[in-house]
Amino acid sequence: MKRCFAKLSALLLLALTLPLTAQDLASFEKRVTMKTLPNGLTVIILRRPEAPVFSFFTMVDTGSAQDPLSKTGLAHMMEHMAFKGTSDIGTTDYAEEKVALAKVEETYAAYEAERIKRVGRDPQKLAQLQKEWQDAIAAADKFVVKNQFGEIVESHGGVGMNAFTTYDETGYMYSMPSNMIELWAAIESDRFANPVMRDFYKERNVVMEERRMRTDSSPTGRLVEQFLGTAFDANPYHRPTIGYASDLQAFSATDALNFFHQYYLPSNMVIALVGDLDPDQLMPIIERYFGQIPAKPKPTELTTVEPPQNSVREVKLNDPAQPFYVEGYHRPSYLDPDDAVYDAITDILSNGRTSRMYRALVRDQKIAAAAAGFSGFPGTKYQ
């Protein structure tokens, strides 16, 4: 959570109209209101009344590093499912839909148990189980109101609705008119309190296609995946955020809901809001809506430490594509005193056309079309 607060504070600083060096830091701090609710949710508000709008950013302190074994891609899948609605949003009759979704899970479990058999799998039985599963999906689909969550946001002036998943965290964001703040609190608290895994297997197919496009069919994507798999042994950064194809094909809506209940907790989340907002008026609204989410202890941090690397590791792909080169060095986590040093080194070496890498490789030697570097790839939470 300390890392999340640092990132969110940086976001708030960037929201100011003048460069940070021109600001009175003490004055800035007076404009920031921060409170932790009784259930553990941390809320940060920066009042910026120049326009009657606000933006928010919700950070969940979990990412693909928390993906369970044999269920890689689950954190990213949960990000997709967060837009599918709740028990109130996205359904014509949730009581009936809930029964139908339970049938989907029941038939999928039977189908998957037969599919993964190593010995004695019955093709005819598998085909019948698959049909029963698909029929159950079709029955549940009758209750779905497609994209209702997004339509509510957009029809009330919301823009920029987006989300992302990294190894370390998951983020959600969009902007709305300031007079829609209570609507925002209602729907955002609802999606983190009452998620429904509707259209799960259809969305899983979307993610599988995303993997095929960005990794399996992309020379660069395949190289980066193998690069990380070679660079790390024990650290969960060696697994792809989008997940392995075989895992995507296997995990269930029940798995996703279990992941949600384990990691999407108030104590594991921070919400930052910037805009034409009065903290004294807004905080009671947030407490009324988000405070209803039950409190649970913050999840236990991963403790696995990457063993020292004592020799060079290389991976090479022979592909009919433009040459692409990646080189990496292990670094400590963000808790290390030298964390800022790595950012400074990266800035000097690879930030823009005046950086040393760009000048040497692109401008002077003309051996590269582009050159870039990152101090926090693939993550900085674990080492």
PLM feature spans:
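M16 family metallopeptidases and their MPP-like homologs
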Residues: 46, 51-67, 73-77, 89-190, ...
